[in-house]
Amino acid sequence: MNSNRPLSPHLQVYKLPLTGLISITHRITGVALSAGLLCIVYMLVMLSLGAESYATLQQFMQYWPAKLVYWGFIYALFFHLCHGVRHLIWDAGKSFDKHTLQQYAVYELLASLLLTFMTLLLLYKPEFLWMLDQRFQK
């Protein structure tokens, strides 16, 4: 065997572009959403079992690790949605130049963060929606 052959560098040497990281993250969020849906089905089963299991579920959802997983699921959902919209744009044959790919990757990250923030705001502070409604009626 020839030992003078060049070795391929390890993955730590490569600096993936943002679009590559987004693509990998899209696949990871797809798997996470599948696991999250199993958790949601389990929660629905607990809800259907009666008041005692519902109280247990409420108590469990008060712990910060459970909230962190819940918030992560919401972010993964919106990230996956935004990347899906990006794929629809690509299916239309648009936005294939390098600059636009980078630009849309940043937009995708910002949109998913904004949608997550707005969802959490409406979940934890529903009066915010009422305040917006009052402001726009004036």
Regions found by a protein language model. Give the residues of each.
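Membrane-embedded alpha-helical bundles that constitute the cytochrome b-like, heme-associated redox core
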Residues: 1-138
